[in-house]
Amino acid sequence: ERIGNGKVYGIDYSALCIKHSKAQNRKNILCNKVKIVLASVSSLPFEDCSFDVVIAVETYYFWPDKLNDLKEIYRVLKQNGRIMLVFEMLKTPEEPDKWKAVEDKVGIKTVTEEEIREMLAKAGFEDIETHKKDGTTWLCAIGVKK
């Protein structure tokens, strides 16, 4: 309802997650409002300048080549398109080792707000904004393809 005549695409590199997503979104898939695709952020199966918005929630830590993956998202965004990255596990100066146990167990690396801003800029994004949720490490980073 909220997307009007638009369409939402979901991607994941896990076949199990794709199966779950298709089950959860069955109605909207049948109405051709949602399409779920098995793919990697490193090689998105979409034409250049295809999307108005790309949103990634709690996935950045797992990307194999963060700079190139951000450039791949930049490629599929339309001019003035936006990327939105959402993080819970944010490394902060106050608690630099807060997520260390998770990093070690899962094999990921958390990043700081400044590192996220720098990577978005290196990938070509402009008008970069970051928004923190007070009292938490939640962060939303937004960049624009000009």
Model-derived regions, located:
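Class I SAM-dependent methyltransferase SAM/SAH-binding core
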Residues: 1-43
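A short beta-strand submotif of the Rossmann-like class I SAM-dependent methyltransferase core
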Residues: 56-59
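A short acidic, Gly/Pro-enriched loop at the edge of an enzyme's catalytic core
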Residues: 42-54
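Helix-to-beta-strand junctions that scaffold the AdoMet/dcAdoMet cofactor pocket
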Residues: 3, 30, 63-64, 77-79
